[in-house]
C-alpha cells in the first residue's frame, strides 16, 4: 500500500511547522498562574476527582493528615481483590477471564450455571458478520494492528441493525458482542499484517466454540493452532489482570467521556482503542521490550549488575535507549510500593522463565526493577517510592508464550475491552451530563490586520497578566 504525497505540501511543511510551534508554546509559569491541573493531576500527583464508579478501585496509598502515605497496591474488581480471583482460578486450575467479564459488566459473581451459559454466549458471539473478514480486514491492511482493529470496530456499526439505540439492553448486547469479537478481529488483523507487510504466510483459522477466550486467541494466532493448557492459562491470567483499571486511566476515561456525549458504542470503543494505542498508555509494554533489547545489544553482559546500572544511568540522562529519560515499566501514578499485576506476573515468570528459555531475560528485568529506584534517587535527589508496573513483566510473559511484539498492546486491548464496556454501561446508567472541562485562553486580544499590511516576521505576543499590560 502506498500513500500519494503532495509535493507542494511536502515543500511547505518545514516552514509551516516552525510557525505552528512558535505560536503554540505555553509557558510553564502560566500553568502555575492559573492553577491548571495538568494531566488532570493535583499538585501531589493524585488524580483530579472526575466521577464515581462501582466497577474498579486502584489502591496504592492512603492520605494521613493531608500526606500521601505509600502502601502495597491492590486492584479491586467490584469490591473483590483481583489477586483473590487469580488465586482461586489457580487453585481450581480453571480459566477465569469470562467470570471477570461477567463480574465487571453485571456487578456480581456468576453461579456455575450462569457462567457456563455466558461462556456459550461469548463463544457464539465471536463469529464476525458474513464477508466481514474479506471486506473489512483483508482489504486495506494496516502495519499497526491497533489501527486495524479500531477501523474494524467502527465498520461494525454498519452491520448493526440498531447501532444508535442507547437502551441498556441494546448497549449490553453490543458490548458482549464486541468483547467476543475484538480478540477475533485482532487475530485476523495480525494474520493479514503478516502477509501484507512481513511477507509471511497467512493462516485464517475458524473459531472453535469449545475454547475459552484465551485458548481461542492462541488457536487463531498460531499457524499450527497448537498450544498447551499451561500456555492458555498463562494468557488467561494476563487477561484477568488487564481487564480493568478504574475509570481514571486514559482509555477508560476516554470511553466514558465520549459516552457522555450520547454517541454510539462503536465510536466510544474505537476511541478507547485509539487511546490505548499511545506509547504513554497501552504501548508502554512494547517500549519495555525495546528497552531490554537495546540493553542486551549495548552491554557485554546484561546480567551483570554493574553494567545494567551503568546502562540505566545513561537512560535516565537521555544518553541511551530512546533518549526520553524514561525507564519503561517502572513507576506508576497510583501504585507506590507494589503493583499487584506486576507481582503476579513476576511470580509466574520466576517459576517458569527457565522452562521457557527466558531465564536471562528474567534476571535482566529483575535487575531493572531492583536498581531503578536508587538510580532515580541519585539523579533527582528525592526519595519517591517507585515500583515495577505491569508493563515491566507483561512483555516477558508474552515472549514466553511466543506472542510477537506487534501483538503486545493488542493483547492488552483484547482484555481491557471488558472494562471499557462496563464503564460505558455505568456511565449510561448513572451519568447525566456531558463531560466539559474548562480551558483558559491565554491569547491576548489584538486587532485584525488587513492582508496588505501583514508582516511575515510578525510575532504573536505571549500572555501578560492584565495588571502588567
Indicate where each model-derived feature is located:
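Non-transmembrane, aqueous-exposed alpha-helical and coiled segments at domain scale
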Residues: 2-469
